[in-house]
């Protein structure tokens, strides 16, 4: 649960919390994360001023995916990756759970058979940066609790700028945030 946003709460923040709040205070992150929703009273920045986030299996799957896919990115980049995962959960052509989406194709055993590359890179998934995991855990909690998905315009795909996959030419580019480019199918209209 979010802590009080009173004057004393800032003194209790750990370094990861301070970094999160600092990134929210930068204009581009506020705009990217739905300033209109905050202004309308629909969302509050206080949700990112919370103690260590926790949750069930779906939270754990989302937090792990964010850790392995976006832990070094800005808050906006982490939220954008979370949006893609949650947009897939809502889309009929993907599994209807976060864990199903995140692990889709992992059973194939193929190097590039996974929807999220960390599941098929041949390396064990080990969370060694606890501060980074705490950060993405907070993002996962906020997103699962219903933070408006306004960054990627309904994207259900993304890739790093280090690659140029052929499939991307068939889709509509919706955003470029940090090292990722986001897409949706051309016949898909954002519903979130």
Protein language model features and the residues they cover:
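Long, low-complexity intrinsically disordered regions
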Residues: 1-5
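Bacterial extracytoplasmic/cell-wall-associated proteins, especially those involved in peptidoglycan
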Residues: 6, 21-192
